[in-house]
UniProtKB/Swiss-Prot annotation:
Pfam families: ATP-synt_B. One of its GO terms (cellular component) is proton-transporting ATP synthase complex. PANTHER family: ATP SYNTHASE SUBUNIT B, ATP SYNTHASE SUBUNIT B', CHLOROPLASTIC. The chain crosses the membrane at residues 30-50. F(1)F(0) ATP synthase produces ATP from ADP in the presence of a proton or sodium gradient. F-type ATPases consist of two structural domains, F(1) containing the extramembraneous catalytic core and F(0) containing the membrane proton channel, linked together by a central stalk and a peripheral stalk. During catalysis, ATP synthesis in the catalytic domain of F(1) is coupled via a rotary mechanism of the central stalk subunits to proton translocation. Component of the F(0) channel, it forms part of the peripheral stalk, linking F(1) to F(0). GO terms for molecular function: proton-transporting ATP synthase activity, rotational mechanism; proton-transporting ATPase activity, rotational mechanism. It comes from the Bacteria. It is found in: Cell membrane. This is ATP synthase subunit b. CDD domains: ATP-synt_Fo_b (cd06503). InterPro entries: ATP_synth_B-like_membr_sf, ATP_synth_b/b'su_bac/chlpt, ATP_synthase_B_chain.
Amino acid sequence: MDDVNSIVLAAGQAAEEGGTNNFLVPNGTFFFVLAIFLVVLAVIGTFVVPPILKVLRERDAMVAMTLADNKKSAEQFAAAQADYEKAMAEARVQASSYRHNARAEGRKVVEDARAHAEQEVASTLQQANEQLKRERDAVELDLRANVGAMSATLANRIVGVDVTTPAAAG
């Protein structure tokens, strides 16, 4: 209860002095706190903010440099991609040319082999025909030479008369 009495007495003294207890009106404490705040603000502005600003500026510079490097890398990649596409197109054209030449050469080799084989077949057929003709002529000559003797032998067997004698011929 003493505390309440002391508070009421303090309020009464303040009212007697003519001061009002309005918190919106600045008093000495406010100016003291304002002075301390300004000192702290000056200390922070002098010793804390410049290093932070320096670090932030360095970071901004690094970010800008990284962006420039990324842009340069993207341009180099695009140029390399274009070179790659160009080289691939040239390689495809060259491969197509090689493939076309190989097919043409293959067709030529096949046609040459076919012509050679046909020539060999024709030559073999001609040789076979010539050999058959020679054998036929030889057999024909042999048969003509032996036809008289064979017919006499055959007649002798069938008829039973010897036809090779001069009496039978006349």
